[in-house]
């Protein structure tokens, strides 16, 4: 037979809520780990007194009774696993697995039996139901009744609030049966009563959640928070974990108490109790117990009189009374040297602590995520700025936690930590390892090339050019003075028959067509294009490098070897720091090299400039010749459309600009054309006068 047995999907009932987990049996005993809370229960083999196998709602289950009276129940076994468990308990624990059935008659009368921490309601010899007395929060008595109230679990959809037992009076004069029943319940119940004096009291401690200042009274079985408005009583059995976390400023400390079930303030539930301490606060603590009692109860963990920092006193007392280890940050160190990362969760900023077995975020709202709950993590670029990134965690329950606005410098440290803990990284395939991913952030500085911005600028220039071309065409087409004057003549001219006669209509249409053709042939004045950037002559000497750049080129590989995986920006920063701290003697060598390079450059430039003018003059002549050709071609195109065709057209259109008349007078045409143009020029004046009359 195997030395160990393991069972998955085994359920444990916790105040009405069924939590799944993993059960492991070994020679040393039995261990159960709750998947939801991560809480581990250990039962040594020597403590197991009795084991019962029975049919339950979730298949089959076992009930273990220990020598100390504690009861543990685990459900979810299959019927076929009975033989395997029977042999294992018998061979390794020397205990027989007894099979017992529950009574299903549905009667509401029977006998009550108290055994260990259980109240069993039996009908005949079979139990109908069992109540864990540790779940009882209050017990009150009436004339013939006993009422039990129970602690509530927020995770259970249906909860048992209270139950009443009718206790019939007896004929015996031995005592009150109702009172005896209540005393049996109270002796094992988890009823919080401040009986006796507190072990110690911490005055006016600053509490972040729930917010306020509270006096904390430490009792043997529970913690009492007394504030100005609210009081809380926290049983030590509800404490899951303790955390002691240093603040980023290294002057304060967080002490975090994880609770299940949480404490309530109205409709608000607090799963974490967070205390904030200053490292400078000291105190001397004296326990309200004798030396012998302190030694017997705490076995050297505490002393009657202690002195030290306030946060150390609180954490030591809590650790001894709750009997839980205090979790502190592991070996993670951020970019600034602290053990936490500044980030934002939901609407508030706080601190994220990478621990050895999980992450914890403080303080609003506090979040604790264990590594075994995590499905994968994701490093995402920040939404508002590229100087930060987001860290996303997805859990097996389907929840997602996004910690945003993390400084870009923390990326490498956090990535290494996640890699070392072997957590699955969701976007690892998108980039080849850590360095390219980090370079994505490094290349997004404001002074780096932004392709998107350049593209948008180009599109804007093209749009502006298109708009200006369209507006130019529109103005050219709309500015047709002949057509406008024709409309005015038809409406206001005293003798419009000359322009509207049938004999001249055909000639007018032909002239208009000729004008349109001339317009198509006519070339627009070329718009001045922005001068292109002067292309640098590849044969020209290169500018000399500065002393720093000469040193950087020589030392780059050395810096890379000393800092493996360093990014381009970090390498530049590192080099700048080294150069800044370098002594003047070492810098003189590189200054001398820079001076030599400068002299060589000046010498090369003189030689280059002596040969350069000949080439420049050739280019200049070439460009001048091209300009002259363009001017002559423009004049040729403008000549045919200006005097000959414009004159007959403007006979009917009755318009001629003054500039056009002067240019025609100065031309070398014959005298007949001169007279025609002068007559045409005089026509608008007479028409204008008649129109004005």
Curated annotation (Swiss-Prot):
GO molecular function, one term: histone binding
Database matches in InterPro entries: HMG_box_dom, HMG_box_dom_sf, PH-like_dom_sf, RTT106/SPT16-like_middle_dom, RTT106/SSRP1_HistChap/FACT, SSRP1-like_PH1, SSRP1/POB3, SSRP1/POB3_N
Keyword check for Mitochondrion: no
Main location, first listed in the record: nucleus
Keyword flag Transcription regulation: yes
Segments of the chain annotated as binding DNA: 541-609
Compartment annotation: Nucleus; Chromosome; Nucleus, Nucleolus
Alphabetized PANTHER family for the sequence: FACT COMPLEX SUBUNIT SSRP1
Protein name: FACT complex subunit SSRP1
Source organism of the structure: Xenopus laevis
Taxonomic path: Eukaryota, Metazoa, Chordata, Craniata, Vertebrata
């Amino acid at each position: 037979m195997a030395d160990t047995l393991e069972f998955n999907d085994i359920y444990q009932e916790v105040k009405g809520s069924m939590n799944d987990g993993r059960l492991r049996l070994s020679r040393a005993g039995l261990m159960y780990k709750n998947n939801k809370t991560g809480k581990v229960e250990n039962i040594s083999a020597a403590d197991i007194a009795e084991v019962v196998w029975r049919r339950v709602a979730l298949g089959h289950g076992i009930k273990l009774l220990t020598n100390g009276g504690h009861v543990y129940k685990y459900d979810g076994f299959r019927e076929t696993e009975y033989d395997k468990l029977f042999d294992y308990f018998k061979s390794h624990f020397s205990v027989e697995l007894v099979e017992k059935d529950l009574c299903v008659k549905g009667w509401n009368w029977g006998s009550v039996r108290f055994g260990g921490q259980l109240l069993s309601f039996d009908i005949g010899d079979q139990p109908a139901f069992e109540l864990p007395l540790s779940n009882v929060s209050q017990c009150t008595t009436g004339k013939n009744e006993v009422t039990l109230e129970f602690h509530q679990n927020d995770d259970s959809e249906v909860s048992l609030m209270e139950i009443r037992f009718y206790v019939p009076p007896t004929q015996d004069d031995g005592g009150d049966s109702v009172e005896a029943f209540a005393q049996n319940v109270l002796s094992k119940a988890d009823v919080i009563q401040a009986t006796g004096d507190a072990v110690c009291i911490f005055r006016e401690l600053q509490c972040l959640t729930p917010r306020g200042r509270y006096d904390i009274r430490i009792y043997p079985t529970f913690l009492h928070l007394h504030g100005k408005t609210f009081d809380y009583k926290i049983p030590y059995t509800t404490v899951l974990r303790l955390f002691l976390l240093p603040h980023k400023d290294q002057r304060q400390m967080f002490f975090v108490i994880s609770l299940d079930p949480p404490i309530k303030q109205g409709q608000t539930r607090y799963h974490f109790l967070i205390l904030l301490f200053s490292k400078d606060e000291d105190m001397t603590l004296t326990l309200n117990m004798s030396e012998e009692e302190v030694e017997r109860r705490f076995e050297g963990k505490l002393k009657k009189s202690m002195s030290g920092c306030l946060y150390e006193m609180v954490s030591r007392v809590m650790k001894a009374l709750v009997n839980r280890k205090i979790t502190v940050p592991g070996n993670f160190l951020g970019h600034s040297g602290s053990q936490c990362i500044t980030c934002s969760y939901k609407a508030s900023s706080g601190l994220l602590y990478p621990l050895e077995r999980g992450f914890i975020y403080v303080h609003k709202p506090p979040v604790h995520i264990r590594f075994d709950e995590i499905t994968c993590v994701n490093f995402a670029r920040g939404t508002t700025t590229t100087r930060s990134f987001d860290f996303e965690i997805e859990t097996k329950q389907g929840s997602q936690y996004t910690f945003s606005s993390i400084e870009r410098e923390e990326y490498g440290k956090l990535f290494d930590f996640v890699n070392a803990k072997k957590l699955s990284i969701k976007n690892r395939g998108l980039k080849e390892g850590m360095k390219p991913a980090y370079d994505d952030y490094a290349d997004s500085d404001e002074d780096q090339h932004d392709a998107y911005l350049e593209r948008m600028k180009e599109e804007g220039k093209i749009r502006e050019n298109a708009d200006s071309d369209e507006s130019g065409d529109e103005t050219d087409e709309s500015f047709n003075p002949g057509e406008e004057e024709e409309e005015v003549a038809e409406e206001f001219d005293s003798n419009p028959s000359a322009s509207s006669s049938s004999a001249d209509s055909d000639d007018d249409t032909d002239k208009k067509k000729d004008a349109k053709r001339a317009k198509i042939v006519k070339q627009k004045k070329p718009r001045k294009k922005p001068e292109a950037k002067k292309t640098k002559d590849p044969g020209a000497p290169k500018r000399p490098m500065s002393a720093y750049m000469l040193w950087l080129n020589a030392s780059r590989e050395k810096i890379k070897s000393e800092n493996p995986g360093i990014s381009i920006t970090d390498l530049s920063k590192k080099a700048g720091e080294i150069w800044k701290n370098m002594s003047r003697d070492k810098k003189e060598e590189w200054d001398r090299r820079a001076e030599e390079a400068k002299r060589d450059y000046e010498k090369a430039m003189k030689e280059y400039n002596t040969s350069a003018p000949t080439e420049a003059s050739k280019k200049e002549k070439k460009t001048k010749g091209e300009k002259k050709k363009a001017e002559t071609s423009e004049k040729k195109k403008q000549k045919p459309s200006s005097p000959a065709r414009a004159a007959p057209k403007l006979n009917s259109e009755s318009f001629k600009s003054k500039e056009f008349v002067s240019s025609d007078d100065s031309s070398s045409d014959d005298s007949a054309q001169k007279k025609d143009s002068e007559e045409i020029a005089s026509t608008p004046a007479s028409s204008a006068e008649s129109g004005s009359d």
